[in-house]
Design a protein with these regions (language model features):
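N-terminal intrinsically disordered/low-complexity leader segments
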Residues: 1-8
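Helix-turn-helix
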Residues: 9-12, 16-54, 58
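Solvent-exposed, amphipathic alpha-helical segments
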Residues: 12, 16-23, 69-73, 100, ...
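Amphipathic alpha-helical interaction segments
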Residues: 12, 54, 80, 84, ...
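Hydrophobic alpha-helical connector segments
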Residues: 58, 69-98, 137
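Hydrophobic/aromatic-rich alpha-helical bundle segments in the mid-to-C-terminal region
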Residues: 110-121, 130-177
Length: 177
């Protein structure tokens, strides 16, 4: 009988893999390559995550969790919160995670497993984390931020995308939301 994964060890491995992906990206790297980079074996990654695709989803989930953890620290005024969140999300060191997120998302909307399992949590977890804020406004903000990130990842036009993010914050400010 196979041993159940040790959750503390899984957490350590996930943290190490997230750090590795931040430094060198994931692309089409093999499990063996990623495992060697974090000082373990591909068998241990398989034991704790099941497959390369499940590892990719675990990375996306962890990065999303870390980003949701920022919500309580954001300013209370919506326009200021948008600007602060964008300032965080636009950091170049997050780009490998953003590329991975969109890759997994695209594969999921095509129905490919295990990526389709990231829905509907990819939205609902943000709605829950926002608490009492109007869910339609949270969903709108999430959609705009993801659209801006997709534009940034695809074009690398930081100035143009930053201007669009500022325009969105200005719209929210003028609307009095």
């Amino acid at each position: 009988m196979a041993r159940a994964p040790d959750l503390a060890r899984r957490r350590e491995l996930l943290d190490a893999v997230v750090k590795e992906v931040a430094a060198r990206g994931i692309g089409d790297r093999s499990l063996r390559d990623v495992a060697a980079a974090v000082g373990t074996s591909h068998r241990m990654l398989l034991h704790h995550f099941g497959s390369r695709n499940e590892l990719l989803l675990a990375i996306v989930d962890e990065v999303e969790r870390r980003q949701r953890a920022l919500l309580p620290e954001l300013p209370t005024k919506p326009a200021a919160a948008i600007a602060a969140m964008w300032a965080h999300l636009r950091q170049p060191e997050l780009r490998p995670f953003e590329r991975l997120f969109f890759e997994c998302y695209a594969r999921g909307v095509q129905g490919e497993q295990p990526f389709a399992s990231m829905f509907p949590g990819a939205v609902e977890e943000w709605l829950a984390a926002a608490g009492t804020t109007d869910p339609s406004l949270v969903r709108l903000g999430l959609a705009v931020m993801r659209g801006l990130l997709l534009d940034l990842v695809a074009t690398e036009d930081s100035a143009g995308v930053d201007a669009a993010a500022q325009s969105f914050a200005d719209l929210v400010r003028r609307a009095g939301a």
